[in-house]
A protein has these predicted regions:
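Active-site-proximal N-terminal segment of extracellular/periplasmic enzymes that hydrolyze or transfer
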Residues: 48-102, 561
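C-terminal motif of bacterial Sec signal peptides marking the signal peptidase cleavage site
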Residues: 43-44
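Acidic/histidine-rich catalytic neighborhood
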Residues: 315, 322-378
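Short, structured active-site-proximal loop/turn typified by the sulfatase FGly-forming signature C/S-X-P-X-R
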Residues: 76-131, 181-182, 531
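Active-site neighborhoods of enzymes that stabilize oxyanions during catalysis
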Residues: 166, 358-548
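His/Asp/Glu-rich, glycine-adjacent segments
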Residues: 126-282, 498
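Metal-dependent active-site segment of extracytoplasmic phospho-/sulfohydrolases and closely related
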Residues: 87, 295-339, 412-414, 423-428, ...
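Beta-strand elements within well-structured catalytic alpha/beta cores of enzymes
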Residues: 62-76, 91-92, 122, 173, ...
């Protein structure tokens, strides 16, 4: 091997072949710094072991749990596609069907099925009314400001969970003495910053250019993001000094007890599929099956290869979950024009009124859309609006809108039990919302009595969408007092408010395509918990993930949550 010091000196020697002591010291310092920098880049961490540990576990251990969040994966799609997915098939069913997998076929998402509340519910095990994240954007009536959760750092979700004293699976793992890692997750409370591998701005920028050049689409490429997620899982993140599985194994001799990986690419890809798919009118199921085969199955193969290479695979359990589904968009509703038309009749925030000046605040929507109505006699937004004087004029304006008449299926109206209209003749206030049928009211004279008679029990909602979706039950657990909207518009399936007409599919609704997903737990370590393959058709909820994951990873849940451990019920 050549001597780098000698090579350097050849270029720097003086005429008498002498090097001054001062220069020699400087040169050695530079070389030493370069050497340290190279080692630092290769390892991606700052903790170096004195000697490399042997590969694989040396003594029997509890299985290592991998929770793989497949964002927006529809109900049953994964299990129905296994024949074309060799890596998923190998992890779920095993060689010669050896693994006694547990398949939860019908898992209900907390509604409406938007990303931030769905993921927060998924990893906390409690409903939005408890964890405080009811949507991606909402109006805080008490603070009189709009809250938005569009952030790479996810710090705002952490702040909300701390304020509501809500713990995550990572909190429970830490208190149970279990190590954990989170990769590209939207919920990070409880995870040490050195154990959270996030998707960098660089990765998203690369994904944008990749999709622009290969498909002419100015939307980040979901496949590039997911490949970057796997790379981060295995190799870590050099800019934030976080170790991936390779670094953890090298420095500690093991991998985390719990690893949560969020593959967000399918959600983006289903929103904006390849142009040839749009041209050929592919269904959402066809798009997602293609993505599973071409993108996610190879990524899972990389994880399995790493685990097998290091003799770790036989001691793992994989829990594949989804946060919500997707629905093909039938028609885009022009949100701006909709608000502009309402602004001709009402004082709408931003058109041009401030929150203090406005009578209503309209939030961006998808399959559903919420509105906050001000009590014009009240001092602030926390005062319940009067039914006839404040709420009825807004609904009258909505009923006359041409888009609403075409796309609206039903309305919900907030009740405020015990806070208003105590002497008002009409329906009692004992629930969070009333069900309001706009079609029957539209045909009436729209007098005060007609309006009050159109307010029906919230349970009526279940008759419209199907009792199995538990829509009324879910809406009772979505909002807390300070963020409860006064009016919720629920569109027909496939009708979406969206400013982007290029979007092919979306979520955020209360119907089956959005609200049903599936879970499956398997892998070589699943034999500790199951003795034969099981398909559970009984309905469970996404918030049941936390107690079931705790069961699989030996984590103690030390405070009340809403989710239930469905694995105990299998015994």
């Amino acid at each position: 091997m050549s001597n780098p010091t000698h090579k350097t000196s050849l270029h720097l020697k003086e005429e008498n072949n002498q090097v001054s002591p001062k220069f020699s010291l400087r040169r050695n310092l530079i070389l030493a710094c370069l050497l340290v920098g190279v080692l630092f880049s290769l390892t991606g961490c700052v903790n170096f072991p004195h000697q490399p540990p042997e590969k694989g576990p040396n003594i029997p251990q509890e299985p290592k749990l991998f929770i793989i969040i497949l964002d927006a994966l529809k109900h049953k799609t994964l299990m129905e596609s296994l024949d074309s997915l060799p890596n998923f098939n190998g992890v779920i069913k095993g060689n010669k069907l050896a693994y006694p997998y547990i398949y939860f076929e019908n898992v209900l998402v907390s509604i409406p099925s938007s990303s931030k509340p769905s993921n927060t519910t998924l990893l906390t095990g409690v409903y939005p009314c408890r964890h405080g994240v009811p949507s991606t954007l909402w109006f805080d009536r008490k603070e009189e400001k709009v809250i938005t959760l569009k952030s790479i750092t996810q710090r705002r979700i952490v702040n909300i969970l701390e304020k509501t004293d809500t713990d995550t699976i990572f909190d429970y793992a830490r208190r149970s003495g279990k190590s954990a890692m989170a990769v590209a997750t939207q919920v990070t409370k409880g995870i040490d910053r050195r154990d959270w591998i996030k998707q960098s701005v660089h990765l998203w920028g690369q994904a944008f250019w990749v999709n622009l050049f290969q498909d002419g689409n100015s939307i980040p490429d979901g496949a590039h993001l997911d490949r970057g997620t796997t790379k981060g899982l295995l190799g870590g993140h050099m800019y934030t000094l976080t170790d991936g599985l390779e670094g953890k194994l090298r420095t500690t001799g093991s991998i985390p007890d719990l690893t949560v990986v969020h593959y967000i690419g399918m959600d983006i890809f289903t929103h904006y599929p390849r142009r040839f798919m749009v041209k050929e009118n592919w269904t959402v199921d066809e798009i997602q099956r293609w993505y599973l085969k071409e993108v996610l199955d190879p990524e899972l193969g990389k994880i399995v290869a790493f685990l097998k290479e290091n003799r770790l695979f036989e001691n793992t359990v994989f829990f594949f979950v989804a946060d919500h589904g997707q629905t093909r968009i039938v028609k885009h509703i022009d949100e701006r024009n909709f608000e502009q038309r309402l602004a001709k009749k009402l004082k709408v925030r931003g058109r041009p009124y401030s929150i203090r000046e406005a009578d209503i605040v309209i939030m961006p929507g998808a399959s559903t859309k919420v509105m906050y109505v001000k009590n014009r006699m009240g001092a602030d937004w926390m005062s319940p609006p009067r039914l006839l004087e404040d709420v009825k004029p807004v609904i009258d304006a909505l009923i006359d809108d041409k888009d609403v008449e075409e796309h609206l299926n039903m309305l919900l109206v907030a009740q405020y039990p015990g806070e208003r209209d105590k002497d008002l003749k009409g329906p009692g206030e004992s629930d969070v919302f009333w069900f309001f049928n706009p079609n029957s009211y539209r045909q009436s004279d729209r007098k005060d009595d007609d309006f009050l008679n159109a307010l029906e029990p919230l349970s009526k909602l279940d008759e419209f969408v199907g009792k199995e979706l538990k829509a009324a039950y879910m809406y009772r657990r979505d909002f807390d007092r300070k963020n409860t909207p006064d009016i919720i518009l629920i569109n027909k399936p496939g009708y979406h408010f969206t400013p982007d007409r290029g979007k092919y599919a979306h979520h955020g609704g209360i119907y089956a395509d959005d609200a049903y997903v599936s879970f499956v737990a398997s892998g070589p370590g699943i034999h500790h918990f199951s003795d034969h393959p099981r398909t559970i058709t009984r309905q469970i909820d996404t918030l049941d993930l936390v107690p079931m994951a705790a069961h699989l990873a030996g984590i103690k849940i030390d405070k009340p949550i809403d989710g239930k451990d469905r694995l105990v019920e299998l015994k």
